């Protein structure tokens, strides 16, 4: 997720299991542990310049960097792999790989054996990190946000990105597609307007997406392509920044430019709120879809002017779950919620003020 810099933050991303997040900044890179919140390390401006995108591979020493911001050291058309475990006094010694393209890189996703690089109209997949070679490339619909998700599971190598048709998603099983071939990916017609946000659950069995309208989140089975459930964020259009599943796929959270983080139940959808009209009985076709939608079981607010990413924290007990929201204004919010919809703030911090003198 990227936004105009506030306090110098150019983009924020969780790692694959949401136990860490990385922060690309005008002043370099910072890596944080989520629970407990603490800085794991940083790369300063002298080492990497201003950075537009940073992704980390699980909790390892490998980072993918893309230049950006006002004083970049690296190009916006290149992805550089930084290996902090490499010995060397010069920062060049730690740059172990480089992937260069003809157009700006908009997103990077990594798993233990592959790296996915997203341009505005094309997606490249390489073997990674040992002796990388190009495995696939896919042409896409115009994708200015660089939307894409990659399943981290050992069992499933699923890639999802916007399809050629407006509002559609393309799913590619990288394990069963032969490198160098352009086998047709499976397509899901998810929305009527362009896709604005997409996310896979941890095992890659469910995909969630929202359109530019941002009022509904739809979930589909990645195997059967059937729609599983439709969740209503609200009635006013909104830009969704982030959608994430809980680790066991029991819940889903979503953040938007309305400054609200919504939490939905997936395992037991009876916990979600319904429209009051649903209890009235028969309604006209115009509002039937509105009535059938499920509304969030809980929600909380963050500063509306500040984009944020959200994810689920570690469960503290069977009936208490937590959601973390991390904003580009430098704030960290942790809320706990119960199945009956109670939601209370448990922690607030300013992660940009947490400093560790250690380099990454």
Swiss-Prot record:
Domain comment, as recorded: The L/FRRG motif is required for recruitment to PtdIns3P.
Family: Belongs to the WD repeat PROPPIN family.
Repeat (WD) residue spans along the chain: 4-42, 190-230, 235-274
InterPro entries for this protein: PROPPIN, WD40/YVTN_repeat-like_dom_sf, WD40_repeat_dom_sf, WD40_rpt
Entry function: Component of the autophagy machinery that controls the major intracellular degradation process by which cytoplasmic materials are packaged into autophagosomes and delivered to lysosomes for degradation. Binds phosphatidylinositol 3-phosphate (PtdIns3P). Activated by the STK11/AMPK signaling pathway upon starvation, WDR45 is involved in autophagosome assembly downstream of WIPI2, regulating the size of forming autophagosomes.
GO MF assignments: phosphatidylinositol phosphate binding; phosphatidylinositol-3-phosphate binding; protein kinase binding
Protein name, per record: WD repeat domain phosphoinositide-interacting protein 4
